[in-house]
């Protein structure tokens, strides 16, 4: 890079450090709050973004495998590399899969990887690439092997979930917010109700929180689309039932105050 030779390990560490905010949002704000539903939500969203001008069925590659970097002069007068904060979509999916493995959901993690490999297009990429954001002549394309990024993903996911943090009173994020098999069972139950057009929350299944409803909405929408329902029709059904469920959760909470 420039006149310097950078070891791959340093480059990989730098990439994860520069993108850790978005990675943590996926792990903590996605997987730990909504469980496997987040993988479907994420993959559907990325696919929609990347096909909005052509439509999903006319777009071969639904997940991005490239991004950009910046070179800026630091206080010492040297040029410093920084990766843009959003990791390419394909790698984000594999990081989410690593987080699902970490919370004990290997089957869902496998599903995430399979869907990502399908959505990425003609073939699974060998490298993820970054180009200079300004298109400056002479600056190289940075290429990091996909397999190396994947191998590092479980360590990154585990650190984000399990590392005690001073800001949280020396407990980990995974001790504050978490998704368990019990959480998933509630979300699956609600998803079945939504797909049937039912919105009355059960009173014999323990506490139901808005996170259960939100996760269920993603699962139900995915389920309807997979069964052949037109996406717009499915969205209308899920929106109506999910909003009614959220109203009930809010009313229950306000009654307890």
Question: Residue locations for each model-derived region?
Answer:
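Non-catalytic terminal regions of proteins
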Residues: 60-257
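Short helix/loop segments within enzyme catalytic domains
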Residues: 2-58
